[in-house]
């Protein structure tokens, strides 16, 4: 179920302040955040945000097609190591 339109998109205030500051001084360093739940706004376009995936910060360069999605969608938390090999096929 999506969020109500009258509420608007959710963005952590500290993340919004960091991004606005980075845009104002034209800083190219990634903005480090743990806020995977924040929605990407049009103000974030062109900024690299380092999103925490539980182990490390994954750099995410925000483009116009990402607007409206959550930051956590672009920093995967699970790694797939593959299914175990079939023992019958090894013979």
Swiss-Prot record:
Q: Name one GO biological process term.
A: ribosomal small subunit assembly
Q: Which GO terms describe its cellular component?
A: cytoplasm; small ribosomal subunit
Q: Which InterPro entries match?
A: Ribosomal_uS19, Ribosomal_uS19_bac-type, Ribosomal_uS19_CS, Ribosomal_uS19_SF
* Swiss-Prot/TrEMBL keywords: Ribonucleoprotein, Ribosomal protein, RNA-binding, rRNA-binding
Keyword Transcription regulation tagged: no
Q: Which GO terms describe its molecular function?
A: rRNA binding; structural constituent of ribosome
Q: What is this protein's function per UniProt?
A: Protein S19 forms a complex with S13 that binds strongly to the 16S ribosomal RNA.
HAMAP family assigned? Ribosomal_uS19 (MF_00531)
Sequence similarity? Belongs to the universal ribosomal protein uS19 family.
Q: What is this protein called?
A: Small ribosomal subunit protein uS19
Which organism does this record belong to? Leptothrix cholodnii (strain ATCC 51168 / LMG 8142 / SP-6)
């Amino acid at each position: 179920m999506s969020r109500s339109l009258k509420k608007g998109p959710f963005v952590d205030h500290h993340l919004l302040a960091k991004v606005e500051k980075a845009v104002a001084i034209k800083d190219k360093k990634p903005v480090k955040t743990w806020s995977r739940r924040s929605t990407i706004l049009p103000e974030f376009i062109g900024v690299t945000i380092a999103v925490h995936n539980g182990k490390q910060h994954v750099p995410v360069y925000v483009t116009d097609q990402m607007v409206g999605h959550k930051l956590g969608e672009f920093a995967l938390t699970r790694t797939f190591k593959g299914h175990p090999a079939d023992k019958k096929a090894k013979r």
